Amino acid sequence: LITSVSEEKVLNVAPFSYFNIVTSNPPIVSVALQRKNGELKHTTKNILSSNEAVIHIVDRENVFDANQTAANLEEGESEMSLTNFTPIPSEKVDIPSLKEAKIRFEVTLHGHVEVKADGAIGADLLLLRIKEYHIAEDIYHEGRIDPDGLAAMNRLAGHDYAEVGRRLTIARPE
């Protein structure tokens, strides 16, 4: 989930499917947001305007609330009213965080790429620099995140989500 704030100070909460790590130094992640009929989504508009956002990792405990944020609301309406999420102040950005998220990243806009197909812009790729991160103490052990404790959910396409499944550990060659 991404929280962002509009120029009118409306808190926007939105799910996203296309999210990845770009680099650890500097810590940058990417988020790709599809356009709807060529128009910027509210999240994209907000981030391009404020240069800030907060990324939250969805887990088994909050996936149903996260799904509610996919509602198509008019500009100026907040998805928060559809959820049981609790907004809390962030430390490094002016965008509220969601208390219930076990992992969240406070980010600033590092770069923006308009992705074109046949001359039309179909998506916006945002490169977001992590300024602060928060990891719940009960899922962080000996410098590692406990994947079972996190119980992360992945947003797929349409109505589908997936849980992180079976892990395979393979030693790397020296």
Task: Kindly label every feature range from the protein language model.
Residues 1-174:
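Basic, polyanion-binding surface patches
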